[in-house]
Curated annotation (Swiss-Prot):
It comes from Chlamydia trachomatis serovar D (strain ATCC VR-885 / DSM 19411 / UW-3/Cx). The gene is lpxC. The lineage of its organism: Bacteria, Pseudomonadati, Chlamydiota, Chlamydiia, Chlamydiales. Pathway: Glycolipid biosynthesis; lipid IV(A) biosynthesis; lipid IV(A) from (3R)-3-hydroxytetradecanoyl-[acyl-carrier-protein] and UDP-N-acetyl-alpha-D-glucosamine: step 2/6. One of its GO terms (molecular function) is metal ion binding. It catalyses: a UDP-3-O-[(3R)-3-hydroxyacyl]-N-acetyl-alpha-D-glucosamine + H2O = a UDP-3-O-[(3R)-3-hydroxyacyl]-alpha-D-glucosamine + acetate. This is UDP-3-O-acyl-N-acetylglucosamine deacetylase. GO terms for biological process: lipid A biosynthetic process. Its EC number is 3.5.1.108.
């Protein structure tokens, strides 16, 4: 396995905003953390109870990813986690005053800006970067995910919305790095179909959703604050979600991930299979 210095933030940073699903205003604080802390969530800085950002703590995947531990819950974590993972931040304490991370403008831009504002500090201890040795695979109905051995972390995603001609079929393949995330992925906003709005509201979701933090796709056009940031913004946002969900594996790893029509639930399923494979390979080395 490869190794590099562990990394944390240089200073504490804060952001206040509204959660997209519950619609509550929340204060988000990111603080530096000691080596081997990992990425952990809590609602209060005075609390000793933290939720580690790990697959074992996933409790919900309905339109976002939710973590819980011992009765404490934090939802819509994927955009923030994708930013931390892509920037190589291993150790950070995250405090959120409500049960949902603020959505910002629906992209990862606000979290990227927070990390830039905080700065990144290398630490003395190292973190091992695992390399997947054998392919792993997950399929459910038309959703397909696979991860193959690679010397880099790469995602190739195919999005197919046969029922919405405005989105249609989109494909994007990228090696994920701080630079590619910053330029190609972080600006891409969450999206929904206009035809889904009533269903989502009946489910108690998108209570804080608006054109300022989401893009709506109709059969004959787009409802958005400004133009699309990329012609294929939806598939790029799907890559953003996938990075955040796979970061819950809990360690940096190298693989070529291929996804067709995946969402949070299937992302987590693949993440569990990757984790099982990495743990098995580590046992073989021992």
């Amino acid at each position: 396995m490869l190794g590099r210095a562990q990394r944390t933030l240089k200073r504490k940073v804060c952001y206040s905003g509204v959660g997209v699903h519950f619609g509550k205003a929340a204060m988000l604080t990111l603080e530096p953390a000691e080596e081997n802390t990992g990425v952990v969530f809590s609602h209060h800085a005075a609390s000793e109870q933290y939720i580690p950002a790990r697959l074992a703590n996933v409790c919900g995947t309905g339109r976002s990813t939710t973590l819980s531990l011992d009765g404490s819950v934090i939802s819509t974590v994927e955009h923030l986690l994708a930013s931390l993972y892509s920037f190589g931040v291993d150790n950070v304490r995250i405090y959120c005053s409500e049960d949902e991370i603020p959505i910002g403008d629906g992209s990862a831009q606000v979290f990227m800006d927070l990390i830039d504002q905080a700065g990144i500090q290398e630490q003395e201890q190292t973190v091992q970067i695992a390399r997947l040795a054998h392919p792993v695979y997950y399929q459910y109905q038309d959703t397909i995910l696979a991860a193959f051995p690679s010397d880099e972390f790469k995602i190739s995603y195919t999005l197919h919305y046969s029922h919405n001609s405005t989105i249609g079929t989109q494909y994007r393949s990228l090696v994920i790095s701080e630079e590619s995330f910053r330029k190609e992925i972080a600006p891409c906003r969450t999206f929904a179909l206009y035809s889904e709005l009533c269903f989502l509201m009946e489910k108690g979701l998108i209570g804080g959703g608006c054109v300022g933090n989401a893009v709506l796709f109709k059969d004959d056009g787009v409802i958005s604050l400004g133009k699309l940031r990329f012609p294929d913004e939806p598939v790029r946002h799907k890559i953003l979600d996938l990075i955040g969900d796979l970061s819950l594996v809990g360690t940096p790893f190298l693989a070529h991930v291929i996804a067709v029509g995946s969402g949070h639930s299937s992302n987590i399923a693949l993440g569990n299979r990757i984790l099982e494979a990495l743990q098995h390979e580590q046992e073989l080395v021992k």
